[in-house]
Structures are given as structure tokens and as C-alpha cells.
A protein has these predicted regions:
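Membrane helical hairpin/interfacial module
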Residues: 32-104, 112
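C-terminal transmembrane-bundle signature of multipass membrane proteins
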Residues: 23-24, 47-53, 57, 193-199, ...
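Juxtamembrane helix-loop boundaries in multi-pass membrane proteins
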Residues: 1-25, 62-90, 109, 113, ...
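First transmembrane helix
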Residues: 15-21, 44-55, 123-126
């Protein structure tokens, strides 16, 4: 099957999110800078392609794009484009500092953060409004893809932190917005968790192609922990850092539980999964949790967390390589466009 613009899947943004978070993870653990910089360049190339193609599809095939947004499964996946912009912004802010000109880094992070945040809110509101007003969503269409809009919202505070540090006159406003976005995404995450839990225990599991979406739930847990620590650190208030670190660790622990539980469910309920584009749903959630592990290792000054962060980073890079290689092979053979 050859590439067709009208059939370009709405979840390609997950590849940008995944590559960006791997870049951040390798920087957070302290690996040689050329690794994270190379990954940032790759993430930037992928981001440009995905954004341009997605934009072209919205211009030339608007009705198909709107149909995806209204779909109870694809609608959630549409938010990955916004997530890609925000994860890219976080990667530029983390890795670009000290490498690229300060003005370029701040400007790029600001533009991507604003664009990503606006898209995240618009897509999230549109998706949720459609679900509420449709009132006939089949239970089998409830999936882990519903986690994506909350996940994307929770990335926004991490993109705001470097801006708050570089723009001291606006620091209080930016940090306040960060806490607000964290609350927005966190509450939505817990609501979706309850809905997905009820759906999963009372109905058959989603089809194979959606199995990786069950794994997405660990992502927001890691991101919430990261948000708490980073926002507290950016405030310059040691007392707030001390208060947020245990809460962040609690969320990290829930993310670890979710990771093991979802892998057990996938292993027992599905067996061997065929590769599909949805495999990128494994990369970003695990990457977010891995970065949280590295940050908590530094905050707690914990040798145990440091070892876990190293192991998780190695596994993350291996997962990203496997997913990337399979994606490139699918593009070469044309099979990826069927998903």
C-alpha cells in the first residue's frame, strides 16, 4: 500500500513525542551530549514532516480530518500532534540550552508551547464535547487512547518551566499557568482511569491494534511527578520542593504499578502483538516515567533510583530503536499506511 495523504493516521504525532522524550531521557541521565543532541535533531526532522503532512491533510481533506476528531478512538489520537509540539519544546529547552543560541531556544520553546497548548485545549474540548453530546459511544470504543488529551495537557507545565526561568518578569504568571494545566490534566487523567477500568473489567479487551494504548496510563503518572518537582524547583522555594517531592514519588509509584499491570494484561490477553503504528504508545509513556525516575534520583539523592533510571533509560532506548526500525521498515514496504 502506497502513501496517501487522505489516509495519513492522526497518531503519527506519537513518533515525535517518543523521539523527543528519549532525547530528554538520555540528557537527564547524563549520557554523552552528542546522543541527546542527535536525538533532538531526529525529533526535529520527524516533527517537521508530521506537522507539515498533518497540516496538508487538514487543508486538503478537512472532512476526513474532522471525522477523525469526532471518532471516539481516533479523536483522542488526534491530540498526539499537539503532544508532539509540546514534547519537542521540552526537548529543545532541555538540550538546546548551552548548545544553541539562547534567543533561538527561548523563541522556539515559546512558539511551540503556545501552538501546542492551544491545539491541546482545542482538540481536548472538541473531543470531550463530541463524546458528551453524542451519548451513543459504544463501550468497545473506550480505550487507552482517551488518555492522550490529558497526557498532552500535562506536558504543558514542563514546556513552561524553561520559559519561566528565562523570563523572570513573567515567571510567576508562567508558573501559575503551569500549576493550572497540571490540575486540568490530572483530574481528567483520574476520570479517564476510572472509566477505562470499568470498561476493561466488564467488556472484552480492545483489538490488537489498540493494545498498546493500555500502556499509556503510566505516562501521566510520571509526567505529574515531573511537573510537581520542576514547577517547585523553578519557583526557587526549597520548602515547596520538599513538599512536592514525596507527592511526585507517589505518582511515580502509581506509574510503576500501571506499567507492570498493563504489561501483564497485554501478555495474558493478547500474546504476541503484530507491529503497528500504535506501538509508539509504548515509547512516550515509558519515557516520561524514565525521566521522572532520573529527576527523583537527583532530588532524593537516591542510589536505588539512580540504578533504576539507568536500567529504564537503556530499556527505553532499546524500545525506541525497535519501534523506529519497524516503523521505517513499514514505510519502506508500505504496510505502515494500512494502520
Amino acid at each position: 500500500m502506497s502513501f496517501r495523504l487522505d489516509s495519513f493516521a492522526p497518531n503519527w504525532g506519537a513518533s515525535v513525542m517518543g523521539t523527543s522524550v528519549v532525547a530528554v531521557a538520555t540528557a537527564a541521565i547524563g549520557w554523552p551530549v552528542w546522543i541527546s543532541r542527535t536525538l533532538l535533531i531526529l525529533a526535529s526532522l520527524v516533527a517537521v514532516v508530521v506537522v507539515v503532512v498533518t497540516g496538508a491533510r487538514w487543508i486538503r481533506h478537512r472532512e476526513l480530518a474532522l471525522a477523525d476528531l469526532r471518532h471516539p478512538i481516533k479523536g483522542g489520537m488526534t491530540a498526539t500532534v499537539a503532544g508532539g509540539l509540546l514534547a519537542w519544546a521540552v526537548a529543545i529547552g532541555r538540550i538546546g540550552a548551552g548548545w544553541l543560541p539562547d534567543g533561538l531556544v527561548t523563541g522556539a520553546v515559546a512558539v511551540l508551547t503556545v501552538a501546542g497548548a492551544v491545539l491541546a485545549l482545542m482538540i481536548g474540548w472538541a473531543f470531550m464535547t463530541n463524546l458528551f453530546t453524542n451519548q451513543s459511544t459504544p463501550t468497545e470504543h473506550i480505550s487507552g487512547a482517551w488518555f492522550i488529551p490529558p497526557v498532552v495537557t500535562i506536558i504543558i507545565p514542563l514546556a513552561l518551566v524553561p520559559l519561566a526561568l528565562e523570563l523572570p518578569d513573567s515567571s510567576a504568571d508562567l508558573l501559575a499557568l503551569g500549576w493550572g494545566f497540571l490540575g486540568m490534566g490530572a483530574v481528567l487523567y483520574f476520570v479517564v482511569t476510572a472509566v477505562l477500568f470499568l470498561r476493561t473489567v466488564s467488556h472484552p479487551l480492545p483489538p490488537d491494534a489498540l493494545a498498546p494504548t493500555l500502556f499509556i496510563g503510566m505516562g501521566p503518572a510520571g509526567l505529574m511527578g515531573l511537573d510537581m518537582v520542576r514547577l517547585a524547583q523553578a519557583s526557587g522555594n526549597p520548602g515547596l520542593v520538599d513538599a512536592m517531592t514525596p507527592l511526585a514519588t507517589m505518582m511515580w509509584g502509581f506509574g510503576f504499578w500501571w506499567m507492570i499491570a498493563s504489561l501483564l494484561v497485554i501478555r495474558r490477553g493478547y500474546g504476541r502483538l503484530p507491529f503497528s503504528l500504535s506501538w509508539w504508545g509504548f515509547v512516550f509513556p515509558f519515557g516520561a516515567w524514565t525521566v521522572a525516575t532520573s529527576v527523583l534520583a537527583q532530588t532524593w539523592d537516591s542510589g536505588l533510583f539512580d540504578v533504576m533510571a539507568w536500567i529504564a533509560t537503556v530499556l527505553l532506548v532499546a524500545l525506541w530503536l525497535m519501534t523506529s526500525i519497524n516503523t521505517l521498515a513499514g514505510i519502506r514496504r508500505g504496510t505502515i499506511w494500512a494502520h
